[in-house]
């Protein structure tokens, strides 16, 4: 049986370094989310993306600014 899709906010990055920095920042602050392969619907320079519940978009955007993480794009998708 297929898993139910949920709305997610997805951040893409130009480099793997920035993707890993996002993962580390989220772990340090206890924010939800995880690294995923970039979904087919979008493209990214490094092939890795950060996925978090769509309701946590504002918190994730604050984390990006606070830690100086450079993103390529931000999307809301059903994943």
Positions of PLM-derived features:
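Short, flexible, solvent-exposed loop/turn segments with mixed acidic/basic and small polar residues
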Residues: 1-2, 35-41
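Short amphipathic alpha-helix segments
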Residues: 14-32
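Short proline/glycine- and acidic-rich turn/helix-capping motifs at secondary-structure junctions
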Residues: 40-46, 76-79
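Long, contiguous binding/interaction regions
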Residues: 3, 16, 59
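C-terminal structural segments of small proteins and small subunits
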Residues: 51-79
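Short aromatic/hydrophobic contact patches that present stacked aromatics
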Residues: 10-12, 47-51
């Amino acid at each position: 049986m297929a898993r139910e899709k949920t709305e997610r906010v997805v951040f893409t990055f130009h480099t793997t370094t920035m993707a890993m920095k996002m993962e580390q920042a989220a772990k340090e602050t206890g924010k939800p989310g995880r690294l995923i392969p970039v979904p087919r619907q979008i493209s990214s320079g490094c092939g890795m993306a950060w996925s978090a519940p769509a309701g946590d978009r504002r918190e994730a955007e604050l984390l990006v600014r606070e830690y100086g993480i450079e993103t390529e794009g931000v999307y809301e998708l059903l994943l």
